[in-house]
Amino acid sequence: GSGKTPHVEYLIRLLHDKVKIAVLSRGYKRKSHGYVLADENTEMSDIGDEPFQMHQKFSDIYVAVDAKRVRGINNLQSNEETKDVDVVLLDDAFQHRYVKPGINILLVDYHRLIIYDKMLPAGRLREPLSGKSRADIVIITKCPKDLKPMEFRVLTKAMDLYPFQKLYFTCINYDTLKGVFTGKELKDPKDYHVLLLTGIASPKQMEHDLKPMVKEMNSLSFGDHHRFKNKDIDRINEAFEALPEPRIIITTEKDAVRLREAEGLYESVKESMYELPIK
């Protein structure tokens, strides 16, 4: 929930004109096994929702999945079709010790700062705080856009980084709503009753940001990477039908990938469902 995919996409936009990029991911909850390189016939279930999202958005990069990252990197470097790769971006490998990266980037959620957290099971940390010393770059994500200079200084001191480590701050920018099934854009949702539909790790930020932008908002949340079953689709249909007119559903790009493959959504739901891209 720290914003790995938007930051990987930012790096893709930053680098793709200069170098040939491959994204290598674990491919969480995919149905395939081993190493898979995405092509024009690849489906979401082959590589997972987030890799598939990037595969759809960026046609000039390679997207591959492999739980064994070293094997995945070796395949990218040795296979004829991908041997022109200059940079491999791994979206969740800070603790994958078999990989020795050229640059380590650590993302820290502004709302869940690791300096105030504890190790599992008391907190959410998977390793001691001292592990942050492996990072070349630390990014505090999901910051308020009006972060004051004093808070920059306080956070910089609290993070207690080494001189060689760079610290950056990022915030979320929302793009124009786009129809999940129709492709139509919706510039302003302020007059709509909204069902916010999410299956992500940390939906509260999105709820907080969207609430002032719409007439009224109800939320329907599922677990991260949730695969929508028939009973879930029924809940979505019923929750949408219960909203007053005019009404729409807003969901994330990642959820839209899975919802497009779901069966049983009412046509009225499909026509009124929008994804909210973030950068």
Go through each PLM region and give its residues:
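Short, flexible loop segments at boundaries between secondary-structure elements
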Residues: 223-227, 268-279
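Acidic beta-strand-to-loop metal/phosphate-binding motif
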Residues: 247-254
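C-terminal accessory "lid"/substrate-recognition subdomains
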Residues: 113-246
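Short, aromatic/basic amphipathic alpha-helical patches
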Residues: 78, 151-160, 210-211, 259-270
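Hydrophobic residues at beta-strand termini and immediately following loops
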Residues: 64, 108, 170, 220, ...
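Phosphate/Mg2+-binding loops and adjacent switch elements
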Residues: 27-163
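Walker A (P-loop) phosphate-binding motif
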Residues: 1-40, 145
